[in-house]
């Protein structure tokens, strides 16, 4: 981690990148970026650059792993060795394995897995450039890739984090805020249904601050959801 800046929030309430506490970083999503995948998406959030690919539903081998009444969803989150400044060993580490598990659990409630018995739906998320918030960005990109693959879903899953920085609750923490902030609250939800599929808290917050963080993260999810829908509409037209 680079040296901590003197102040993360200025006296006039602005953050290092000029945002107000309740503002998100610039967000851009594109659907259908990989020809060989059944579904794919590219997402930029601030300096984050993420690609998601979906393969399936396809027959699951070995057969003893098949579920007779539903599809098995598998998720692999990976940070490219060149995605961060410090040297990263190739292959999954403990953090990547944990994020893969949580991301799968965040997305699975949205998928009609019962429509695809005895199959596997494989989701791969590759972080090409990391700038905090890659877990939420990966879930949001993967959701668009699932829709692009034509997989039946109850709703898209949109994800966004809030955090606590120098005593203030902020939306979508960036690199320094994530590294030097007091708390982080990633949240994923199906906005149409209002159902939360992932909610974590890492750090120290009062109950009031936590409530405020959840409210802010939900606001962020609605912004993400709008961009997810725009990306799919741009590719496919319609609603």
Swiss-Prot record:
Disulfide bonds: none annotated. The gene is rrp41. Catalytic component of the exosome, which is a complex involved in RNA degradation. Has 3'->5' exoribonuclease activity. Can also synthesize heteromeric RNA-tails. One of its GO terms (biological process) is gene expression. This is Exosome complex component Rrp41. The keyword Cytoplasm applies. It is an enzyme of class 3 (hydrolase). Component of the archaeal exosome complex. Forms a hexameric ring-like arrangement composed of 3 Rrp41-Rrp42 heterodimers. The hexameric ring associates with a trimer of Rrp4 and/or Csl4 subunits. HAMAP family: Exosome_Rrp41. Its EC number is 3.1.13.-. The keyword Nuclease applies. Signal peptide: none annotated. Keywords: Cytoplasm, Exonuclease, Exosome, Hydrolase, Nuclease. Residues 1-21 are annotated as: Disordered. One of its GO terms (molecular function) is 3'-5'-RNA exonuclease activity. Pfam families: RNase_PH (PF01138), RNase_PH_C (PF03725). Belongs to the RNase PH family. Rrp41 subfamily. It is found in: Cytoplasm. It comes from Methanopyrus kandleri (strain AV19 / DSM 6324 / JCM 9639 / NBRC 100938). One of its GO terms (cellular component) is cytoplasmic exosome (RNase complex).
